[in-house]
């Protein structure tokens, strides 16, 4: 099986206010407070889709900030019909949808495979977060697919690309 990865970019000059916010945000040790403050910030500070490069037929990842404590934030610009692999995350993951529509299929680990448990649709202004086991990368196993061209902000407690990949 060939696994195609998204294209990753570092930062964006028009998003300095986001980096300043994130630098302060990541000094907070409580993931739930991080989620609350991020929702509040993003409702007050519009982030346009056009600020981030597309990468058809998948999605692009623009790293907005990486902190010394390993927290990172990135923007994902999804092409319509883009689908991620089934993957896990570090201890904490937070997604906030700014534009478009995303379908998130949730899975549970079963050996080296994943078993689907739920599917949810997210629209602009909606978010979800996951809190799992520290020092593992198989938390919050899911697959994301874009029903429309979309833009989402993601915050992780470590490098999301370390997430374990699963098959069904």
What are these regions (language model features)?
Residues 50-80:
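A short glycine-rich, His/Asp/Glu-containing loop-to-beta-strand
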Residues 1-47:
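N-terminal leader/capping segments at the start of a protein or of a new domain
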Residues 106-142:
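Short acidic-glycine-tyrosine-enriched beta hairpin
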Residues 90-109:
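Glycine- and acidic-residue-biased ligand/ion/polar-headgroup-sensing regions
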Residues 74-88, 122, 133-135:
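Conserved short histidine dyad/triad with adjacent acidic residue
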Residues 87-90, 146:
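Short glycine/proline-enriched turns and hinge-like loops at secondary-structure junctions
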Residues 94-96, 142-163:
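A short hydrophobic beta-strand segment most commonly corresponding to one strand
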């Amino acid at each position: 099986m060939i696994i195609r990865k998204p294209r990753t970019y570092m930062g964006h000059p028009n998003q300095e206010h986001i980096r300043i916010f994130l630098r302060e945000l990541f000094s907070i040790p409580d993931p739930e407070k991080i989620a609350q403050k991020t929702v509040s910030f993003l409702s007050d500070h519009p982030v346009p889709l056009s600020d981030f490069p597309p990468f058809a037929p998948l999605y692009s990842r623009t790293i907005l900030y990486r902190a010394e404590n390993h927290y990172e934030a990135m923007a994902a610009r999804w092409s319509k019909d883009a689908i991620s692999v089934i993957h896990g995350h570090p201890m904490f993951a937070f997604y906030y949808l700014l534009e478009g529509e995303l379908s998130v299929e949730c899975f549970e680990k079963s050996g080296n495979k994943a078993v689907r448990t739920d599917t949810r649709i997210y629209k602009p202004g909606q978010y979800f977060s996951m809190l799992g086991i520290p020092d593992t990368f198989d938390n919050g196993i899911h697959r994301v697919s874009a029903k429309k061209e979309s833009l989402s902000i993601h915050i992780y407690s470590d490098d999301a690309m370390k997430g374990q990949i699963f098959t069904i």
